[in-house]
């Protein structure tokens, strides 16, 4: 772990001037470190800079590190594969073709120095920030569904010829993404969570969750599927802090953990984070606006999931060979996997070092405990019933019922 490899603001400016491909005619170039100004894990794991010139043209420079930057500064080493820079660049290239306008433009890719330079996204909210502020958007759920459906289809055998599919999957299989998430979602969250700090008021409940033999069995079951089944490209780190939104569009970023695996992983990760926001509202003082916003979140989840099914089905019917496709079986397995990943995502974001901002912003520990306890309850209920729930409305009702009780 070499902290000296992290470039400084001055070195970032010198790098831009040396390349001259970007801001070629600019006379004044400045850099501002963004590492403490982001709600995304992007700024925790990597070295980020906002670069701008005298005409207020802006780009983001990202230096990909071989360890989690924030942890390293605290003298804790959490290694990360440097090759993920290839996953980021080539996944964005894929999405620019299949989902134009949904991902940022890439202006420079320098694999020798582990640097990638992107479009700077302005005048948009991180979805997590928007949820915390209780903002509402009309079409965002549909746009996210479109991104997920197109990814699940255009990178799968339903669209690609076998040779193309194998080439794409073999490339992304080199990224080590599956092992990264195996460690974070399965091992460190449930199976072997060694030395994990957590809110002491929920420590016993988390321990009970982790020692539950049914939970352990179900975790091992979905883990085996996750590690061995390769269906399509997945973003990997698909949660509400990696999606920019406004009234009319979305921008999805931080794709360095893109890999080949289960498309349900992205859906499960995002819904899990949405349910964490729903849970966090229980840590707030009760009022009618809180209740209405919880309903909005559940409607968002329902609309997004149903829209995904509709869009994916249309792609299959219009462009796929249906002779080897059973759509009903596909969605049944997809839902089971999604439910499992929702549960595991929720638990993984309750530990102190991974605590999502939705919960972290509840400063009163007793009120935060109420929200976290609810999150544990729904995680367990969903996991217990991951093969019984038949549609998204059953899931929504399951989230509502514990609160009523």
Where is each model-derived feature located?
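Conserved NTP-binding catalytic cores of kinases and kinase-like/nucleotidyltransferase enzymes
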Residues: 1-114, 393-405
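Active-site activation/catalytic loop segments of kinase-like enzymes and analogous catalytic loops
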Residues: 264-319, 342-360
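ATP-dependent phospho-/nucleotidyl transfer catalytic cores
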Residues: 128-143, 147, 157-235
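A glycine-centered beta->alpha junction motif in the catalytic cores
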Residues: 64-71, 120-134, 153, 276, ...
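Conserved structural core of kinase catalytic domains
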Residues: 105-143
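Active-site acidic catalytic loop and adjacent metal/ATP-binding pocket
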Residues: 38-55, 59-60, 219-265
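ATP/Mg2+ or Mg2+-diphosphate-binding catalytic cores
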Residues: 327-405
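Short, flexible/disordered intra-domain loops and linkers
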Residues: 68-83, 282-296, 360-368
């Amino acid at each position: 772990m070499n902290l000296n490899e992290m470039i400084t603001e001055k070195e970032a400016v010198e790098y831009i001037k040396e390349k001259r491909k970007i801001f070629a005619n600019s006379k004044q170039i400045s850099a501002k470190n963004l590492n403490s100004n982001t709600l995304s894990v992007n700024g925790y794991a990597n070295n980020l800079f906002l670069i701008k010139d005298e005409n207020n043209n802006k780009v983001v420079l990202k230096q990909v590190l071989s360890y989690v930057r924030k942890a390293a500064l605290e003298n804790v080493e959490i290694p990360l594969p440097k090759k993920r820079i290839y996953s980021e660049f080539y996944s964005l290239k894929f999405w620019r073709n299949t989902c134009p306008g949904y991902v940022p433009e890439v202006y420079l890719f320098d694999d020798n120095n582990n640097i990638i330079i992107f479009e700077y996204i302005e005048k948009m909210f991180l979805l997590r920030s928007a949820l915390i502020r209780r903002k509402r958007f009309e079409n965002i759920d549909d746009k996210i569904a479109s991104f997920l459906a197109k990814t699940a289809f255009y990178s799968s055998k339903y669209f690609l010829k076998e040779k193309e599919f194998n080439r794409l999957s073999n490339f992304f299989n080199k990224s080590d993404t599956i092992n990264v998430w195996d460690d974070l979602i399965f091992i460190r969250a449930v199976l072997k969570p060694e030395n994990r700090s957590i809110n002491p008021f929920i420590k016993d409940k988390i321990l009970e969750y982790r020692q539950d033999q049914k939970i352990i069995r179900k975790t091992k079951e979905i883990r085996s599927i996750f590690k061995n089944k390769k269906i399509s490209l997945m973003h990997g780190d698909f949660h509400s802090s990696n999606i920019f939104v406004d009234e009319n569009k979305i921008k999805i970023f931080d794709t360095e953990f893109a890999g080949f695996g289960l498309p349900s992983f992205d859906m499960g990760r995002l819904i899990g984070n949405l349910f964490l926001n729903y849970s966090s509202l229980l840590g707030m003082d009760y009022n009618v606006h809180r209740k209405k916003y919880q309903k909005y979140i559940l409607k968002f989840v329902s609309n997004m999931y149903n829209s995904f099914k509709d869009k994916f089905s249309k792609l299959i019917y219009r462009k796929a060979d249906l002779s080897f496709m059973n759509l009903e079986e596909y969605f049944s397995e997809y839902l089971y996997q999604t439910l499992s990943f929702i549960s595991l995502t929720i638990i993984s974001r309750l530990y102190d070092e991974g605590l999502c901002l939705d919960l972290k912003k509840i400063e009163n520990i007793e009120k935060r405990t109420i929200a976290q306890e609810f999150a544990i309850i729904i995680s367990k209920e969903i996991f217990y019933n991951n093969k019984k729930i038949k549609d998204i409305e059953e899931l929504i009702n399951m989230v509502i019922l514990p609160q009523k009780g």
